[in-house]
């Protein structure tokens, strides 16, 4: 339903969200020690900082832990660090950056139990290596702006380091994208040839190396284009995972993926990379007693981008008239069975920046006609 044109403006969304929808077999599956999950994409790389793919992020949710993350309430919290640095607690101190801008120095201390899957502690050197590789343009690690703004790292001790940014933002302490890299395994490969590192990384050549992983699970086997197999990480010091083994199986065709679920070849379909909503709703009508369905609106929104180079569309009244002329509530009811909200702005209601007081444009054909007559 998404249509696009060359423009930065957009017609207010038809519906907020590609849904996150999960399908799971009944509780009998929970008694087994292996969980098989079906998704529609296979990651092109397993390296934490090279390329961005939903399938890779899904695997990393089991196998890696970032320094910070946004929790379910969209608050920044520590995962690998002991406490979140803030200006108020003194761990973040505004400073003047080399470029003359207002910058900030942010100090983190890693948890003592944080370790790679081979038992090697995660240290400040792993952060330093990730930064060094990220600053090298030839390596192709992203996001580029993070590594540009982070102009210096001061290592205080094995677990403590200070990040120096050349600008002060409202999320100065959110370093979700600064992903630690196991320097004891990867640094020598990178130093040998930064440009070729993306094709020589152990994350793709030897992904079953335990020392690449820091989450409750580690990768033990991969079958290119078909599956990634995970097992519990013995070096993990958090709560023991529920399953001994997880198999993430790729089935790109959604009809075949549904057939795999019905045949019991997968135990669940991931909402992030699963069935389109219409197919999932049809399956729910047919098999509601066999599976548990969980539908959650996502943060993306279906919308139409408009080309403001066209004189007619450059007029705000025309764009508002288009919104008033579309019965978006009816679209949501007909296409999505009312499972998603109408998007009244580009900020999803799940986002903490959402303002419920913003004015809403209703379905108003007469109002649309008056605006066009002007």
Question: What do these predicted ranges mean?
Answer:
Residues 13-25:
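Bacterial N-terminal signal peptides
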Residues 87, 91-94, 218, 229-237, ...:
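Append "and occasionally in soluble cytosolic enzymes with long acidic Gly/Pro-rich linkers
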Residues 84-140, 156, 162, 257-260, ...:
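Aromatic- and charge-enriched surface segment that lines or borders ligand/interaction sites
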Residues 33-41, 82, 103-109, 127-130, ...:
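Short, well-ordered beta-strand elements
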Residues 38-98, 132, 210-214:
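N-terminal lobe/hinge region of extracytoplasmic solute-binding protein
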Residues 69-75, 179-241, 245, 255, ...:
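Gly/Pro-rich hinge or "lid" segments in bacterial periplasmic/extracellular proteins
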Residues 109, 143-196:
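Surface-exposed binding/hinge segments that line
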Residues 134, 152-153, 220-234, 247-310, ...:
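Extracellular/periplasmic solute-recognition and catalytic clefts
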């Amino acid at each position: 339903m998404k249509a696009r044109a060359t423009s930065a403006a957009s017609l207010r969304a038809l519906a907020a969200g590609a849904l996150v929808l999960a399908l799971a077999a009944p509780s009998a599956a929970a008694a087994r020690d292996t969980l098989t999950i079906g998704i529609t994409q296979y990651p092109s790389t397993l390296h934490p900082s090279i390329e961005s793919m939903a399938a890779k992020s899904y695997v990393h949710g089991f196998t890696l832990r970032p320094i910070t993350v946004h929790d379910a309430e969209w608050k920044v919290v520590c995962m690998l660090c002991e406490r979140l640095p803030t200006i108020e607690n003194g761990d973040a101190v505004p400073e003047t950056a080399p470029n003359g801008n207002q910058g900030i120095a942010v100090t983190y201390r890693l948890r003592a139990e944080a370790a790679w899957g081979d038992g090697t502690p995660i240290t400040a050197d792993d952060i330093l290596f990730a930064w060094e590789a990220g600053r090298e343009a030839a390596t192709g690690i992203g996001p580029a702006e993070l590594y540009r703004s982070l102009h210096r790292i001061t290592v205080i001790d094995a677990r403590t380091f200070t990040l120096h940014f050349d600008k002060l933002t409202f999320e100065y302490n959110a370093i979700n994208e600064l992903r630690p890299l196991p320097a004891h395994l990867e640094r020598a490969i990178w130093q040998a040839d930064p440009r070729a590192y993306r094709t020589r990384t152990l994350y793709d050549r030897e992904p079953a190396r335990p020392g690449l992983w820091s989450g409750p699970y580690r990768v033990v086997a991969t079958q290119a284009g078909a599956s990634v197999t995970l097992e519990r990480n013995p070096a993990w010091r958090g709560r023991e995972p529920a399953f001994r083994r997880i198999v993430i199986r790729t089935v790109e065709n959604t009809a075949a993926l549904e057939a795999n679920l019905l045949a019991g070849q997968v135990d669940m379909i991931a909402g992030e990379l699963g069935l389109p909503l219409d197919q999932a709703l049809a399956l729910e009508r047919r098999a509601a007693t066999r599976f548990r369905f969980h539908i959650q609106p996502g943060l993306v929104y279906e919308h139409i981008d408009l080309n403001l180079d066209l004189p007619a569309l450059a007029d705000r009244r025309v764009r508002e008239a288009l919104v008033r002329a579309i019965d978006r509530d009816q679209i949501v009811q007909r296409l999505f069975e009312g499972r998603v909200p109408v998007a009244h702005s580009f900020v999803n209601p799940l986002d903490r920046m959402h303002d419920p007081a913003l004015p809403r444009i209703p379905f108003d054909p007469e109002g649309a006609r008056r605006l066009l007559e002007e």
